[in-house]
Amino acid sequence: MTQWYPASPALWQGRDDSIEAPDARRLFQTVTRSETFSPENWQQKIALMGFACDEGVKRNAGRPGAAGAPDALRKALANMASHQGHERLVDLGNWVAPTPDLEGAQQALRDAVSRCLRAGMRTLVLGGGHETAFGHGAGVLDVFAQESVGIINLDAHLDLRQTDRATSGTPFRQLAQLCDAQSRAFHYACFGVSRAANTQALWRETQWRNVTVVEDLDCHDALAQMTQFIDKVDKIYLTIDLDVLPVWEMPAVSAPAALGVPLIQVLRLIEPVCRSGKLQAADLVEFNPRFDEDGAAARVAARLGWQIAHWWR
């Protein structure tokens, strides 16, 4: 059974420069840590939550270890400088899946996300494998049932696989099927896709589903496509699979990318999403601390989370 735990205060530690000036502060000094899961107490804030689950990665024959990512990323975030927007972060703890019940874990996340959004919060989730996306995205779809929701995925993989059970490779097929069941349009864009990592069958699925696809080779010039997608929806859920980054920037994932999209290009692509006023939910997934020897990859991932919170409007 999936369980909730508050984040350990030991994770939020860092260098104290406050003697220099009142605004010489770091995230460990400005992030609020909640001892209870009580989003109703934090309206207009950003709910920082961990989804400590990699059962979907295991089912997808990947390299397990992403269940340890939420706390590793908190540690990497803690000592980063606090700027405008970061004071809105409230750490609402981790959803921990200690058993192979992935479906139950996804439902728990779905319910938690729905509760946060209905309380007037926005959600920043630290996965976990990309199975995080079904629980997170379903929660967004549940709350904004009468509005068009755009799903923006930065990922080397389309994650539209067809299997007999949920995995880290199926979340967007699951979300598409949920949209079908709710009689609503499925608005999905995937940036950074590696043609070498996705079968022809998956490419056919994108055509049938009318998915916006931008390959890794073309992301240097994709702002217009991103803007067009933003303009056509009411609300946005942004999910970043860290394997979209090249292996030299992000080796600590289940499936490192030989080519990938450099961090600077990823940041330029997500800035208009964050500033659009439409972003309701975002996550970082697939980070695997087992393959991060010196903490450098955690800092790369943390910079993405830091930037999202700073730009979020």
Curated annotation (Swiss-Prot):
Mn(2+) 1 binds at H130, D155, D159, D241. One of its GO terms (biological process) is L-histidine catabolic process to glutamate and formamide. Mn(2+) 2 binds at D155, H157, D241, D243. It catalyses: N-formimidoyl-L-glutamate + H2O = formamide + L-glutamate. Keywords: Histidine metabolism, Hydrolase, Manganese, Metal-binding. Its EC number is 3.5.3.8. It comes from the Bacteria. GO terms for molecular function: agmatinase activity; formimidoylglutamase activity; manganese ion binding. Pathway: Amino-acid degradation; L-histidine degradation into L-glutamate; L-glutamate from N-formimidoyl-L-glutamate (hydrolase route): step 1/1. Binds 2 manganese ions per subunit. Its cofactor is Mn(2+). InterPro entries: HutG, Ureohydrolase, Ureohydrolase_dom_sf. Catalyzes the conversion of N-formimidoyl-L-glutamate to L-glutamate and formamide. Belongs to the arginase family. This is Formimidoylglutamase.
